[in-house]
Swiss-Prot record:
Functional summary from the UniProt entry: Catalyzes the conversion of dethiobiotin (DTB) to biotin by the insertion of a sulfur atom into dethiobiotin via a radical-based mechanism.
Annotated cofactor note: Binds 1 [4Fe-4S] cluster. The cluster is coordinated with 3 cysteines and an exchangeable S-adenosyl-L-methionine. Binds 1 [2Fe-2S] cluster. The cluster is coordinated with 3 cysteines and 1 arginine.
CDD domains tied to this protein: Radical_SAM (cd01335)
Pathway(s) this gene product operates in, as recorded in its UniProt entry: Cofactor biosynthesis; biotin biosynthesis; biotin from 7,8-diaminononanoate: step 2/2
Cofactor(s) required for function per UniProt: [4Fe-4S] cluster; [2Fe-2S] cluster
EC number: 2.8.1.6
Protein name (record): Biotin synthase
Catalyzed reactions: (4R,5S)-dethiobiotin + (sulfur carrier)-SH + 2 reduced [2Fe-2S]-[ferredoxin] + 2 S-adenosyl-L-methionine = (sulfur carrier)-H + biotin + 2 5'-deoxyadenosine + 2 L-methionine + 2 oxidized [2Fe-2S]-[ferredoxin]
Record-linked Gene3D superfamilies: Aldolase class I
Gene Ontology MF annotations: 2 iron, 2 sulfur cluster binding; 4 iron, 4 sulfur cluster binding; biotin synthase activity; iron ion binding
Taxonomic classification: Bacteria, Pseudomonadati, Pseudomonadota, Gammaproteobacteria, Lysobacterales
Positions annotated to bind [4Fe-4S] cluster: C55, C59, C62
Length: 347
């Protein structure tokens, strides 16, 4: 019997899963994964930053915050033709979804028609579309949906009780409100967080509890491992134990059985062996390409070699004109180069 989809997880239940002996936790997570997905199929994603740097927020992990000296230069919003050129390249390389990220606290209303034109153009190429632009109003979310947007990324970042240690310029409720606007507009959600920012295991549990308690589980759950960037307040933080990261993947898979669980930022520093454990634990999505926002990502050749060694295949997707997934196929996220309001830690 397939694992039930629950929205009533309790903190002590998820904590008990985290605390299981490592082999037992992986066994349980792998079993849940196989109930809902082909374990040999992995969703492949890349990102294009359509507006880099200059963000007014103070997220302690983010090299795009203008208040930190990180060497990231602010750039204006890209022209639509330049974005579409990147989208064509992505499609030619086998992409099926193109994601556009902008380093904004929230887009201004005057920005929406420009982004909508990008979305419509990408959609016309036959690609799925996703975006991460910061906080959205309900009207903005509907405008993006009308333009052809399929997915919207907006992360919770961390547990509610640790959030104020990381961010002061945006409230947790602001994030929940944006997710509500996105769902109400009929968009699919991509929502996860970052680990390795000094939080406790109980707070990692709290992040997963917040995600699994949303009215609808996110379609994609990116689990980012902190990429320490010189100039940001979190540079020099203690490194997260690799097995703790795998535990995070495993409990995410058990708590949200039908969501795509994505290895996101931080994968560049992971060994092939660690990534293999993550796939065994239920990860079935990665970011692919040479850059992930403003931080590195494993070279494409390394990813292809790892897939070959493990016998993994990229997922395919077929989406109808209204953006609905067909049957057993799942998205193969696509984009191009670098940020959004996931900064170094992405969609």
């Amino acid at each position: 019997m397939a694992a039930a989809i629950r929205h009533d997880w309790q903190h002590d239940e998820l904590q008990a899963l985290f605390d299981l002996p490592f082999p037992e936790l992986l066994f349980r997570a792998a079993a849940v994964h196989r109930e809902h997905f082909d374990p040999a199929q992995v969703q492949v994603s890349t990102l294009l930053s359509v507006k880099t740097g200059g963000c007014p927020e103070d997220c302690a992990y983010c090299p795009q915050a203008q208040r930190y000296s990180t060497g990231v230069n602010a750039q204006k919003l890209m022209e639509t033709d330049a974005v579409l050129a990147k989208a064509r390249q992505a499609k030619a390389a086998g992409a099926s979804r193109f994601c556009m990220g902008a380093a904004w606290r929230s887009p201004k209303d005057r920005d929406i028609p420009k982004v909508a034109a990008m979305i419509a153009g990408v959609k016309a190429l036959g690609l799925e579309t996703c975006a991460t632009l910061g906080m959205l109003s309900g009207e903005q979310a509907r405008a993006l949906k009308d333009a052809g947007l399929d997915y919207y990324n907006h992360n919770l970042d961390t547990a509610p009780d640790y959030y104020d240690s990381i961010i002061h310029t945006r409230q947790y409720q602001d994030r929940l409100d944006t997710l509500e606007h996105v769902r109400d507009a009929g968009l699919k959600t991509c929502c996860g967080g970052i680990v390795g920012m000094g939080e406790t295991r109980a707070q990692r549990v709290g992040l997963l509890l917040a995600l699994a308690s949303l009215p609808a589980h996110p379609d994609s759950v990116p689990i980012n491992k902190l990429v320490q960037v010189a100039g940001t307040p979190l540079h020099g933080s203690a490194e997260l134990d690799p097995f703790e990261f795998v535990r995070m993947i495993a409990v995410a898979r058990i708590a949200m059985p039908r969501s795509m669980v994505r290895l996101s930022a931080g994968r560049e520093a992971m060994s092939d062996e660690l990534q293999a454990l993550c796939f065994l634990a239920g990860a079935n999505s990665i970011f692919y390409g040479d850059k992930l926002l403003t931080t590195g990502n494993p070279e494409s050749e390394r990813d292809l070699a790892l897939f070959a060694r493990l016998g993994l295949q990229p997922m395919a997707v077929q989406v109808d004109a209204e953006g609905h997934d067909h049957g057993g196929t799942v998205h193969a996220d696509i984009s191009a180069d670098t940020p959004g309001c996931g900064c170094a830690h992405a969609a």
